Curated annotation (Swiss-Prot):
InterPro entries: FAD/NAD-bd_sf (IPR036188), MQO (IPR006231). Keywords: FAD, Flavoprotein, Oxidoreductase, Tricarboxylic acid cycle. The keyword Signal does not apply. SUPFAM superfamilies: FAD/NAD(P)-binding domain. GO terms for biological process: tricarboxylic acid cycle. It catalyses: (S)-malate + a quinone = a quinol + oxaloacetate. Belongs to the MQO family. Pfam families: Mqo. The gene is mqo. This is Probable malate:quinone oxidoreductase.
Length: 508
């Protein structure tokens, strides 16, 4: 890392040294190698907020196990749209990572992505019926080839022994399993990407840590003047023709300071997260899967419970959660004044509308905050009946600042997902929101590049380069099973992931 530099100009500034900025910086360097890029991070190390391994679940979201991605439609059918969309977006990420591994710009993929089966697990006749219908709908689509289904307790016990340990009674159970799921250490991925960028000659890409962007204003030529304060009380200014705000929850404040009209009306609803974590080898060794179930009735989408295998720094662990909470901080290392400081005349009405229409969410968060350790482990026992309090400890996860935006009908809505807000001239863009986030970082950043650099993006030179980086885009993969299989075969080989298994006979 480098020290301070006075009154400099660069081509591109990225605020925040997480997986989004690392992905965008890598893309832009591949597309425009001569561009001077600086990444500015408030903390003393990179990938220390939302991208840090234990601040997120590490799920390579691909629509394989997330039941809230496949709702039952009004006509009784299962809607696959979101699952297919998420699946093909993750294929774009795997293609990009594979390219970087093949070119030596990423090291051993086993340091950041691991093959972990993705499972869905349900109890009770109604949910078993739902999962069975879901399986029949999904198994016909190439995105979900290899999905297995069972209502046989002995098979579920083979797939995930902890689910059956000590489970009594004859309650109907069902599960699906896809062997090609993944666990991703987004912190390790981010650090690898940034380390390779820093190796570029002549400080073509520079990463500064321990520095905070305090303000940003327009220059007369349309570029941006960025005021930066160091943790050592130094001050400097930096000029850039393009700025990306990828600072997690802090992006909203910076978007507001930019003054671009496109940012008016946006607000944030911060939700904290917690996990139960187990590191005991005798327990961890008996579970190799990410097992997702259904959220309780009335609970928000980010509350879907799951029992996961995690691989962090070469050490396996188990994670269960998430348990939500409420704080007024926008970052795990932020200030309790973050929410209050984000209130503007332009977003007050949407915020009040969301507060009026989401009382059940507020109640849910309050109830979650009040949970004792015993009560959290009780929830875990719906997955792992033999769970003991002393085997699990609480791990505080990162902050998720959900997007609040204007709505012509309701006044304001709460949006669970990510959103890019960009200036009309493409000189500044901010990433707001949360899940599925990091899994689809490549797709989000490709769309951002197209939005902010439309002429260059459409040029023959950039299109050819983009085809090298991500040969098959999501919209193409969704409708071309042969192409999807070919792409997966290559990426899974490069990333050392297991091959897709043939789809079994359907269960009736």
């Amino acid at each position: 890392m480098v020290g301070t530099h006075m009154d400099e100009s660069v081509d591109i500034v990225l605020v925040g040294a997480g997986v989004m900025s690392a992905t965008l910086a890598t893309l832009l360097h591949e597309l425009e190698p001569d561009a001077r890029i600086e990444i500015i991070e408030r903390l003393d190390s990179t990938a220390s907020e939302s991208s840090f391994a234990w601040n997120n679940a590490g799920t390579g979201h691909a629509g394989l196990c997330e039941l809230n991605y496949t709702p039952r439609a009004d006509d009784g059918s299962i809607s696959l749209d979101k699952a297919i969309h998420t699946n093909t977006l993750f294929e774009e990420s795997k293609q990009f990572w594979s390219y970087l591994v093949e070119k030596g710009n990423l090291g051993d993929p086993g340091r950041f992505v691991h093959p972990v089966p993705h499972m869905s697990f349900v109890r009770g006749e109604d949910d078993v019926r739902f999962l069975r219908d879901r399986y029949h709908a999904m198994r016909e689509h190439p995105c979900f080839e290899g999905m297995e289904y069972t209502e046989d307790r002995s098979v579920i016990g083979q797939w995930a022994p902890l689910l059956l340990d000590g489970r009594e009674g004859d309650e109907p159970l069902a599960a699906t399993r896809v062997a090609t799921g993944t666990d991703v250490d987004f912190g390790a991925l981010t650090r690898q990407l940034l380390a390779r960028l820093e190796e570029k000659p002549d400080e073509q890409v520079r990463i500064t840590t321990g520095q905070t962007v305090e303000d940003l204003t327009r220059n007369e030529d349309g570029s941006w003047r960025i005021k930066i304060a160091g943790n050592d009380d130094t001050q400097r200014t930096l000029n850039a023709r393009f700025v990306f705000l990828g600072a997690g929850g802090a992006s909203l404040h910076l978007l507001q300071k930019s003054g671009i009209p496109e940012g008016k009306g946006y607000a944030g609803f911060p939700v904290s997260g917690q996990w139960l974590r187990c590191d005991k080898p005798e327990i961890v060794s008996r579970h190799n899967a990410k097992v997702y179930s259904k959220a309780p009735i009335g609970a928000p989408p980010m509350s879907v419970p799951h029992l996961d295998t995690r691989n962090v720094d070469g050490s396996p662990s188990l994670l269960f959660g998430p348990f939500a909470g409420f704080t007024t901080k926008f970052l795990k290392t932020g200030s309790v004044m973050d929410l209050a400081k984000s209130v503007r005349s332009s977003n007050l009405s949407p915020m009040l509308s969301v507060a009026r229409d989401n009382f059940s969410l507020v109640k849910y968060l309050i109830d979650q905050v009040r949970l004792s350790h015993e009560q959290r482990v009780d929830e875990l026992r719906t997955f792992y009946p033999m769970a003991k309090n002393d085997d699990w400890r609480l791990e505080v996860a990162g902050q998720r600042v959900q997007v609040i935006k204007k709505d012509p009908q309701k006044g304001g809505i709460l949006q669970f997902g990510t959103e890019v807000v960009a200036a009309s001239d493409g000189s500044l863009a901010a990433l707001l929101g949360a899940s599925p986030g990091a899994s689809t970082a490549t797709s989000i950043m490709l769309n951002l590049v197209e939005q902010c650099f439309p002429e260059k993006f459409a040029s023959q030179a950039w299109q050819q380069r983009l085809h090298d980086l991500v040969p098959a885009r999501a919209e193409t993969l969704a409708d071309n099973g042969d192409l999807l299989r070919d792409v997966r075969r290559r990426t899974h080989d490069t990333l050392k992931l297991v091959d897709t298994q043939p789809s079994p006979e359907p269960v009736t």
